């Protein structure tokens, strides 16, 4: 066993990592809009990216360098996704990275990550002009987390110290952005994780894949998959300590915290809902049903209206394509059972109890399909007027 | 070849069909809420139903009678879906149908169709008490179309006379409802088609399947599939005339008109958009991409905002899982090309032209994937404040 302690510092918490946010004039009013994460020690990087076929230029640039490679620096910009920009998008990154390496000769294979407008060239000159403000050793994780925000209502960071039974320890830190856009682009999710654990480089990608399955792949704000979605893990081995079970658990905790923060901070959203599906024929079927619930417009608007509309829950499961049977299905809001294998328990009393569950900021809706042992929990949010406003009225 | 003339009368236009709407007290203020369609001559019925696993009781009742069978009457009610009601839901229908046959001995295998709240018992006594108002011979198609409306902003009916080159003719008529609900239930689509063409009974289901593919299966209001979706075809052979090509064409025209009316009348929607996808690797891929566009929240809110946000269109195609390549893709709003195989044509002038296309009530967005010959057109609508209001605020 091991102990896990929340600590301050975000991506700068692990030994040897620095980060900061600077203002390059991409956002208005001198707001922070460019961030970097740097390791003072040699580090390895591995990442998982969007499945969108039109993966943005920074993703294709990263993939050109390999799966896991030496890298001690990532430059992140808001306001421009550098997506649908073709070969020029890559050239713009190469141009910037050359200037960055010229200015900071200690950088090894610097990479980029972007979020913002799709289909416009990267404002590389503006970014280049701001590189002079970068001080590599700055430990300003909170400013970095702030710089990468777009329509995020709050910045998202987390860090843990992991103590093994023999007293040795390592740290893991991370920051993320989600929410969406204020400009016409897709809602992009970016997450940067740092650790001083001595992670074997051939394990980095697989561990990321394991952890993303129940965290970032389990959330949905609007069901769309951006051209820029990225989860990036930097490991500099500075602690010299590693224990896989402990590291994976800590990685999952970090990613779970940030993923639920991203869902909670869905554009205009006020509520975080955990859709627990159990009793499915398989885990795949549980995933299918749980994700159908997170993306159903009728379910999302019912959550916004704090309406325990179990008929919409049932119908969404029925149309999700999974094996189900109305005489085996059970539906609960929190601990309030409203439908029990063919019996409609929903009366005025139960309705009021279920509605009071939904008035909370965070709650669960549980569907037991009663078929098999497959289970999965997906996280979603409500959809209200603010969502429409953010996504339709950005011009005004 | 043949000629097709629009005529009045809706479902009552074909010879020997009658219909009416009555008020059973299910809706408030004495509004019409129960409808029937009847054939004075012996008729056959065939239907296509929802793929939702929790198909409503009236659907399971119908399926218990066969695929194509003798039937000269359908009773339709609004305000209650009779879904998630188990064996009792079927018993309620049997009870009502017995009373109906007792009152009108000429009825053969009467069936039901319902739309409204999921998970509440059918108010069968109220409906039974109103059966006395039914006059079998009434030709009030418009009142029937009105009775089946829920949140529909307008009633939907259509009829054509089909004239063959030799002067013989037959008629086809139909009515539909869509839009959604004012009560907490799924947005249900119901469509009833009548014809006096001499359709061979063994062709009825296949012809319905062909016609539904490019019509009702090509529309999306909210991406949810209701427990009650139904397309029902009655044929009484009264004209003695049939020519398959002409009949199929007329059937498709009727269903296309009603399906686009349903999409146009999506809850709170103001615009009908045809998403034309061409150049896909296969028709399946074209369907996948076109449907992804109709259900993308970011695309739907951009349409509401009249924002020619081609980046969202591209990204939705990229995440739809179809084969695509940014150097082959072309995107147009109406006739305005905004992205051409890697070249971003979008400047202030093009943006204004594309925005003016989007200010129309009805327009197309065309995506040529440039990969193969697969094509498909799906129909969708915008998503604005009204949608949220209808679906979240029904209590207030």
Swiss-Prot record, chains A, B:
Compartment(s) of residence: Cytoplasm
Any one annotated GO CC term: cytoplasm
Broad class of the protein's primary localization: cytoplasm
HAMAP family in UniProt: ArgJ
Binding site for substrate: 150, 177, 188, 267, 391, 396
One protein family per Pfam: ArgJ
Annotated site residue numbers, Cleavage: 187-188
EC number(s) on file: 2.3.1.35, 2.3.1.1
Residue numbers annotated as active site: 188
UniProt pathway: Amino-acid biosynthesis; L-arginine biosynthesis; L-ornithine and N-acetyl-L-glutamate from L-glutamate and N(2)-acetyl-L-ornithine (cyclic): step 1/1; Amino-acid biosynthesis; L-arginine biosynthesis; N(2)-acetyl-L-ornithine from L-glutamate: step 1/4
Entry similarity comment: Belongs to the ArgJ family.
Keyword presence, Transmembrane: no
Protein's name in the database: Arginine biosynthesis bifunctional protein ArgJ
Keyword set, alphabetical order: Acyltransferase, Amino-acid biosynthesis, Arginine biosynthesis, Autocatalytic cleavage, Cytoplasm, Multifunctional enzyme, Transferase
Purpose: Catalyzes two activities which are involved in the cyclic version of arginine biosynthesis: the synthesis of N-acetylglutamate from glutamate and acetyl-CoA as the acetyl donor, and of ornithine by transacetylation between N(2)-acetylornithine and glutamate.
GO MF annotation terms: glutamate N-acetyltransferase activity; L-glutamate N-acetyltransferase activity
Biological processes, Gene Ontology terms: L-arginine biosynthetic process; ornithine biosynthetic process
Subunit composition and interactions: Heterotetramer of two alpha and two beta chains.
UniProt-annotated site: Involved in the stabilization of negative charge on the oxyanion by the formation of the oxyanion hole, residues: 115-116
Matches recorded under InterPro entries: Arg_biosynth_ArgJ, ArgJ-like_dom_sf, ArgJ_beta_C
Reactions accelerated catalytically: N(2)-acetyl-L-ornithine + L-glutamate = N-acetyl-L-glutamate + L-ornithine; L-glutamate + acetyl-CoA = N-acetyl-L-glutamate + CoA + H(+)
Species of the source: Wolinella succinogenes (strain ATCC 29543 / DSM 1740 / CCUG 13145 / JCM 31913 / LMG 7466 / NCTC 11488 / FDC 602W) (Vibrio succinogenes)
Listed SUPFAM superfamilies: DmpA/ArgJ-like
């Amino acid at each position: 066993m091991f102990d896990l302690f929340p600590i301050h510092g975000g991506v700068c918490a692990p030994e040897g990592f620095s980060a900061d946010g600077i203002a390059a004039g991409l956002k208005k009013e001198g707001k922070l809009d460019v961030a970097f994460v740097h390791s003072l020690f040699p580090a390895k990087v591995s990442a998982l990216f969007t499945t969108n076929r039109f993966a943005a230029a920074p993703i294709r640039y990263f993939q050109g360098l390999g799966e896991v490679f030496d890298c001690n620096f990532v430059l992140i910009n808001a306001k421009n996704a550098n997506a649908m920009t073709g070969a020029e998008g890559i050239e713009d990154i190469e141009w910037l990275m050359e200037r960055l390496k010229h200015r900071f000769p200690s950088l090894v294979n610097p990479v980029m990550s972007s979020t913002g407008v799709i289909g416009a060239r990267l404002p590389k000159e503006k970014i280049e002009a701001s590189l002079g403000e970068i001080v590599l050793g700055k430990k300003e994780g909170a400013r970095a987390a702030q710089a990468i925000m777009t329509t995020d209502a709050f910045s998202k960071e987390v860090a843990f110290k992991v103590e093994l039974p023999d007293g040795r320890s390592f740290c893991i830190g991370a920051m993320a952005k989600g929410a969406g856009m204020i400009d016409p682009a897709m809602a992009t999710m970016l997450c940067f994780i740092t650790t001083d654990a001595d992670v074997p480089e051939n394990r980095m990608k697989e561990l990321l894949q394991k952890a993303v399955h129940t965290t970032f792949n389990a959330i949905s704000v609007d069901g769309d998959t951006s051209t820029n979605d990225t989860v990036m893990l930097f490991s500099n081995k500075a602690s010299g300590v590693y224990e896989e079970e402990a590291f994976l658990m800590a990685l999952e905790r970090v990613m779970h915290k940030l993923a639920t923060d991203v869902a909670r901070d869905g554009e205009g959203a006020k509520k975080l809902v955990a859709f627990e599906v159990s009793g499915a024929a398989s885990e795949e079927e549980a995933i299918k049903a749980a994700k159908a619930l997170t993306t159903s417009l009728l379910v999302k608007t019912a959550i916004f209206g704090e309406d325990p509309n179990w008929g919409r829950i049932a119908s969404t499961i029925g149309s999700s394509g999974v094996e189900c049977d109305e005489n085996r299905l059970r539906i609960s809001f929190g601990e309030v059972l409203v439908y029990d294998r063919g019996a409609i328990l929903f009366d005025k009393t139960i309705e009021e109890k279920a509605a009071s569950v939904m008035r909370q900021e965070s709650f669960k809706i549980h569907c037991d399909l009663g078929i098999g042992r497959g289970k999965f929990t997906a996280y979603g949010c409500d959809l209200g007027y603010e969502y429409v406003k953010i996504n339709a009225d950005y011009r005004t």
